[in-house]
A protein has these predicted regions:
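Extended C-terminal regions of large enzymes
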Residues: 89-92, 130, 144-217, 221, ...
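Conserved pre-catalytic core of RNA-dependent polymerases
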Residues: 192, 204-208, 252, 256-468, ...
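Catalytic palm active-site di-aspartate
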Residues: 280, 332-333, 344, 360, ...
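Catalytic palm subdomain of template-directed nucleic-acid polymerases
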Residues: 412-428, 489, 493-515, 812
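A conserved non-catalytic segment of reverse transcriptases
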Residues: 422, 455, 507, 511-608, ...
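Non-catalytic C-terminal interaction segments of nucleic acid-processing enzymes
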Residues: 702-789, 793-794, 811-812, 826, ...
Length: 979
C-alpha cells in the first residue's frame, strides 16, 4: 500500500520530533540510545504488560487500538486523501465474522423507521424469491448489519431514526457487509468477569426489560458462560469432528409435495421465538421481524409477511443456491460450560433459517411424534419428563429385583451421522427432506469472533429441527430393543427388566455405534441392581453402580430414599440463586421470585415424586424463600402477612406459593395427567402399582372431594381448593374491620394487576424500591413506618401508614389522578381515538370539568366523556361496609359520578373511571375499559394490549399510594414518576 508523499512541514520538523509527544513517532523508535535507557526499558515493560499495541501501517510506531486512528489523523493526514487500492474480496464467512465482531446492531427497530425498514426488507425478500441468486441472498444476509447498524459510541450528532435512514440510503446505494467497518478496529478477547453475580444480575435485568422472563431467570442462575480462550476454542473444535469418509447420502425422494406457507404460519412462527432470542451471523433478530410485522403497519406488514412466506417456501423446497448453503445454514457459535466443566456448543443460526425450520416442524410434527412412538419422550411429547419419571418409578417398585441401566452418549448431537439422518427423513418424513438436505448434506460454517469451525457431522444444537432429526436417527435402535421398560429422552436412554435381556440390549446399543457415529460415555452410564451384574459391567466398563440413595432420572428421584438428598441439593442451589436477587431492583427481584424462584423452581420435583414425605426439607425451602422476600422488600412480615403472601395474586397474595402446602396436590395432579401415556409404556404388573400409587396420592391431598373428577388432572383445580381454604381462614381470623376490608378488596378481579406488570424501566412499569415496599405493605397489612404525626395535617399515623391515603391533604391524590388520565389518554390515542383533557363547555354546577373527551364518536355516534376518581377502601367512612360488601366504596363513587354528570348523558356517552386504593375498580369502569381493550387489540394486533393497559392503570394507583405514604413523612414529597 502506497502511503503517498509525506509533507516535511508536518512530520519532519526536528523540534516536534524532539518534543515528548503523546503519540509515538518513528524518530523515537529509531533511536538506539534511547532504547537503552532505564526509562525506555520501563516503557517497553509497560507496553508488554499493558493493553495490546498495534503497528502503524505508515511508520514504525506502535499504538493502542484506540489511539491508532487518532495518530493517523494527526501524523499522516495526507493518507486520508490518497485513493487506496481495493482489497481482494474475502470469503463471505469472513466478512460475516468481521461484521459480527465490529458492527453492533439495534436490538429493536425504532417505531419512527419501522415502515421504511419493512418496505426495504420486503424488496430484498422479493428479490431473493425472484432471482434466487448469490447476490440477492448476500443482500439479505447483510441487511440487518447495514440498515440496523448502531452509530459509534459517543456519536450523538444524529437521532436513532436519522441513523437508520442514513444506513438505509447506503444499503440502497449498494453498501453491504463492509459498510463502516474500516473505521473500527477488532476488539481483543473479552476478559473474564470479575464479579459473576453482578454480571449475571445485569444480564438478567436486560432480559427482563426485553420481556424474556425465563431468559432472565437462566441468566441470574448461570455461571456457564465460557470465556474466549484458546482452551475453549480447542474444546469446540474437538466437539465438531470431521466427516467420516464413507458418507452415503440418499437421493431426493420423488414427488415431495410441500404446501405453500401462509402468512398466518409466518406470524405464528415469529411470535413463538423467545422475546430476547439472539441473532445469527446476519444480525437479524426475531424481535426485528416482530417489530416489522406489527399490525400497526397495516399493508406494509402484510406485504412483508407474504414476502417472508415466499422465501420460506424456497428454503423448504430446497432451491437455495449451493454456494450459500454453508453460510445460510451455518451459525454463530456460543460456548457454554456444563456442570462438569466441559463445553457445550450452542449454534445460533440465522433467523430466516430458524423461521423456515419452525414452520416445517409445525407441518410435520404429528407425523414425527406418531412415528417415534411412546418410548421417545423428548420430541414433541407433552410432559415427557413426568411420564418417564412416573413410569420408571412404578417399574422399580413393582420389580425390585430388576436391573436398570441409564445410557448416555458422548457429544451425541454433534457426532450422529448425517447420512443416517437424511435416510430416516427421506423414508419416513419426506416433507422435511429438501430443507434438511440443504442444511446437512454439505458442511456449514460455525462462526466465532476469533475462528470459523467447519460443521461436518451431527445436527446443530439450536436448530428447531435438531431434536426431531436426532430422535429419527435413534429410532432404528429404539425399536430394536427388547427390555420390558424402554424409555428415551433425546439421547438419554433407560432400560429396565430382566438382567440378561438388559445386557443383550446394551450390546445392541454398542453394535449400533458403528452405524450411527454415536459412542456411549461409560463414565456417565449407570447400573442399578440389587445384585451385581457381571454381564452388564463387562458391557459398560467404567460405568457407575448406583445405589437406591442416588437413583434419579430426568432430575427426579426414583426411590423414596433418594428424595431427601435431591431436596438438599436443590436447597443449596436455590440459596445461591436467591442471594443474587437483591442485586436487582426490588420490583424485578419480587417479580422473578414469584415467577421463577419460589414454588416454580420446585415444580418438576413436586410433580414427579412424593416430596410431601420430606416435610422438614420443604419447610426449610419455604423459610429460605420467605427470608429472600423480606430481604428484597426490606419489610417485616408478621405470620398472617407471610401466609397471605403465599396465596396467588388472584386470591389476594403475592404469588410466593408454599411448596409444603402444594407438594401433595402437585404429585396427585401429575399422576392423573399422565396416566394414559404411562399405560402405553408400562407392563401390566407395573401399571397396577402405578394405579395404586395414584389412588393413594389422591387421598393424601385431603381435598379430593372438593375437586371434580374431570378436573383432577389440572393442578390449578387442586391448588385453588387449598388456597380458598387458607383465604377463608385468614378472613375469619382477621382481628380488625380494616383487615377484613383489606382482605376482601385485594382478591377482587384486577386488584393485583400491578403485580403482573413486567418491571421494566424502559417501559415505565417499574416501581422504585420505596414505592414497592409501601405498596406491598398496604396489600399485606404489614407495618411500613414507625408511628408518627402526619407532616401535612398533624394527625397520628399508625405503623401501617393508612392515614396517608385518606388524609385531607394527601400528597398522592393529584399525582395519582394525573397519572391515571395520562395513561388512559395514551391508550385511546394508540387505539386511534384522539381525545382532549378537561374539555371546555362541559362544566358542571360546581365549575369543574370532566377529565376527558374523545374528539370522534366512541359508540353509537356519541362522544365519550369520562371522569376519574380513586377512593380509599380503608377510609373510616367506607371501611365498615367494605368489610362485608367487596367493592362497596368504588361502586358508590361510580354512582356519585353518574349523578354529578347526569346532564351530559343525553348528548354524550359518560363513563366514570373509578378505582380503589387497593387496586380494584367498579363495574361501570370495567365496562368502559372493556370497550377500550377491544379497540386497542384491533389497532395493535396484540391480544395482551388490554391487560397491559389495566396493569399501567393499576401501577398509576399504586404510585399515587406510595406518594401518599411518603407525604406523611415529609412536607415536600418527591414528584411522581409519570412514565
Amino acid at each position: 500500500m502506497n502511503p503517498g508523499p509525506i509533507a516535511p512541514a508536518r512530520d519532519a520538523t526536528p523540534a516536534r520530533d524532539a518534543t515528548p509527544a503523546r503519540d509515538a513517532t518513528p524518530a523515537r523508535d529509531a533511536t538506539p540510545a534511547r532504547d537503552a535507557t532505564p526509562a525506555r526499558r520501563a516503557a517497553s515493560a509497560r507496553d508488554a504488560t499493558g493493553p495490546p499495541r498495534v503497528p502503524c501501517p505508515h511508520c514504525e510506531g506502535r499504538f493502542s487500538r484506540r489511539g491508532l486512528n487518532r495518530h493517523i489523523t494527526v501524523r499522516h493526514p495526507e493518507v486520508r486523501s490518497v485513493p487506496q487500492p481495493s482489497p481482494a474480496p474475502q470469503p463471505l464467512e469472513l466478512r460475516l465474522q468481521a461484521a459480527m465482531r465490529e458492527a453492533r446492531v439495534f436490538s429493536i427497530v425504532p417505531k419512527a423507521t419501522r415502515s421504511l425498514v419493512a418496505v426495504a426488507l420486503t424488496d430484498v425478500l422479493r428479490d431473493v424469491h425472484t432471482n434466487n441468486d448469490v447476490p440477492s441472498w448476500e443482500a439479505l444476509l447483510a441487511f440487518a448489519r447495514v440498515v440496523l447498524q448502531m452509530p459509534d459510541k459517543g456519536d450523538t450528532s444524529r437521532s436513532l431514526p436519522a441513523v437508520i435512514r442514513g444506513n438505509l440510503a447506503a444499503f440502497r446505494a449498494g453498501a453491504r457487509l463492509e459498510y463502516r467497518l474500516r473505521r473500527h478496529f477488532p476488539r481483543g478477547p473479552r476478559p473474564p468477569p470479575t464479579d459473576t453475580g453482578q454480571r449475571a444480575a445485569r444480564i438478567a435485568s436486560q432480559k427482563l426489560s426485553e420481556g424474556d422472563i425465563s431468559g432472565a431467570a437462566r441468566a441470574l442462575c448461570s455461571t456457564d458462560s465460557a470465556t474466549d480462550s484458546a482452551e475453549a476454542l480447542n474444546a469446540l473444535r474437538a466437539k465438531h469432528p470431521p466427516a467420516p469418509p464413507d458418507y452415503s447420502f440418499p437421493a431426493r425422494p420423488p414427488q415431495v409435495d410441500i404446501a405453500p406457507t401462509s402468512t398466518d404460519e409466518v406470524l405464528a412462527a415469529v411470535s413463538s421465538f423467545p422475546p430476547s432470542s439472539s441473532a445469527g451471523p446476519d444480525g437479524l433478530r426475531p424481535r426485528h421481524l416482530r417489530d416489522l410485522l406489527s399490525p400497526a403497519l397495516g399493508a406494509v406488514a402484510t406485504a412483508l409477511a407474504k414476502a417472508l412466506a415466499k422465501v420460506v417456501d424456497c428454503m423448504r423446497a430446497g432451491t437455495v443456491p449451493s454456494a450459500l448453503r454453508p453460510i445460510l445454514f451455518g451459525a454463530r457459535l456460543i460456548a457454554l460450560k456444563k456442570k462438569d466443566g466441559s463445553i457445550r456448543p450452542i449454534a445460533c443460526s440465522s433467523t430466516i433459517r430458524r423461521l423456515a425450520a419452525k414452520i416445517a416442524w409445525v407441518n410435520e410434527r404429528d407425523a414425527v411424534v406418531t412415528l417415534l412412538g411412546p418410548t421417545q419422550l423428548g420430541c414433541g411429547q407433552a410432559s415427557g419428563t413426568e411420564i418417564a419419571a412416573h413410569a420408571a418409578r412404578a417399574f422399580i417398585h413393582a420389580h425390585p429385583d430388576a436391573a436398570l441401566v441409564k445410557l448416555d452418549f458422548r457429544n451425541a448431537f454433534n457426532t450422529v451421522r448425517r447420512d443416517l439422518v437424511l435416510r430416516e427423513v427421506a423414508e419416513h418424513v419426506p416433507g422435511l427432506f429438501p430443507l434438511v438436505d440443504l442444511a446437512y448434506r454439505c458442511p456449514s460454517h460455525l462462526i466465532m469472533d476469533n475462528a470459523v469451525i467447519s460443521s461436518e457431522c451431527g445436527v446443530q444444537q439450536g436448530d428447531p429441527l435438531g431434536p426431531a432429526l436426532f430422535c429419527l436417527a435413534l429410532r432404528p435402535l429404539a425399536v430394536s430393543l427388547q427390555s420390558r421398560l424402554r424409555l428415551w429422552y433425546m439421547d438419554d436412554g433407560t432400560l429396565a427388566g430382566d438382567p440378561a435381556t438388559v445386557a443383550s440390549d446394551v450390546q445392541r446399543v454398542l453394535d449400533y455405534e458403528g452405524r450411527s457415529g454415536l459412542a456411549l460415555n461409560p463414565t456417565k452410564c449407570e447400573i442399578f441392581s440389587l445384585d451385581a451384574q457381571p454381564d452388564l459391567q463387562r458391557s459398560l466398563p467404567g460405568c457407575r453402580l448406583t445405589q437406591r440413595l442416588s437413583l434419579e432420572l430426568v432430575g427426579s428421584p426414583l426411590t423414596d430414599e433418594a428424595i431427601r438428598p435431591l431436596l438438599d441439593r436443590c436447597l443449596e442451589r436455590t440459596a445461591v440463586m436467591l442471594d443474587r436477587l437483591p442485586l436487582l431492583s426490588a420490583h424485578q427481584g419480587l417479580f422473578l421470585l414469584r415467577s421463577c424462584f419460589s414454588a416454580a423452581r420446585m415444580q418438576h420435583l413436586l410433580r414427579t415424586c412424593p416430596a410431601g414425605t420430606e416435610a422438614s426439607a420443604l419447610h426449610e425451602y419455604d423459610d429460605l424463600v420467605l427470608e429472600a422476600l423480606t430481604t428484597i422488600l426490606n419489610l417485616q412480615l408478621p405470620p398472617e402477612a407471610a401466609s397471605q403472601a403465599s396465596l396467588p395474586v388472584r386470591f389476594g397474595g403475592l404469588g410466593i406459593l408454599s411448596v409444603r402446602r402444594l407438594a401433595d396436590v402437585c404429585y396427585a395432579a401429575s399422576l392423573t395427567a399422565v396416566a394414559d401415556m404411562v399405560a402405553t409404556v408400562l407392563p401390566p404388573e407395573a401399571l397396577a402399582h402405578f394405579s395404586a400409587s395414584q389412588e393413594a396420592a389422591l387421598d393424601q391431598t385431603g381435598v379430593r372431594a372438593r375437586v371434580p373428577p374431570d378436573k383432577q388432572s389440572k393442578q390449578r383445580a387442586w391448588s385453588d381448593a387449598l388456597h380458598q381454604e387458607l383465604r377463608d381462614s385468614l378472613l375469619a381470623s382477621a382481628p380488625h374491620v380494616a383487615d377484613q376490608a383489606r382482605l376482601r378488596a385485594v382478591d377482587r378481579p384486577s386488584a393485583g394487576a400491578w403485580l403482573h406488570a413486567l418491571p421494566s424501566s424502559s417501559l415505565g412499569t417499574a416501581l422504585d424500591d420505596r414505592s414497592l415496599r409501601f405498596c406491598v405493605g398496604l396489600r399485606l397489612g404489614a407495618p411500613v413506618v414507625a408511628a408518627h404525626s402526619c407532616e401535612r395535617c398533624g394527625d397520628p399515623v399508625a405503623t401501617n401508614g393508612h392515614h396517608g391515603l385518606s388524609c385531607e391533604r394527601s400528597a398522592g391524590r393529584h399525582p395519582r389522578h394525573t397519572m391515571l388520565n395520562d395513561t388512559l389518554v395514551r391508550a385511546l390515542h394508540s387505539a386511534g381515538i384522539p381525545c382532549t383533557r378537561e374539555p371546555q363547555g362541559l362544566d358542571t354546577s360546581d365549575g369543574r370539568r370532566p377529565d376527558g373527551l374523545t374528539l370522534i364518536p366512541f359508540h353509537r355516534g356519541l362522544h365519550l366523556v369520562w371522569d376519574g376518581t380513586v377512593v380509599d377502601t380503608l377510609a373510616p367512612s367506607y371501611v365498615n361496609h367494605c368489610a362485608t360488601i367487596p367493592g362497596y366504596a368504588v361502586a358508590r363513587a361510580e354512582r356519585a359520578k353518574l349523578r354529578k354528570y347526569a346532564a351530559l348523558q343525553a348528548t354524550h356517552l359518560f363513563s366514570p373511571l373509578a378505582f380503589e386504593t387497593l387496586g380494584g375498580h367498579g363495574p361501570l369502569t370495567a365496562n368502559f375499559l372493556e370497550g377500550v381493550y377491544h379497540r386497542l387489540i384491533r389497532a395493535t394486533g396484540d391480544k395482551r394490549a388490554g391487560s397491559f393497559l389495566l396493569q399501567r392503570l393499576s401501577l398509576a394507583v399504586q404510585r399515587g399510594n406510595a406518594i401518599a405514604f411518603l407525604g406523611t413523612l415529609s412536607s415536600s414529597p418527591p414528584p411522581p414518576h409519570n412514565p
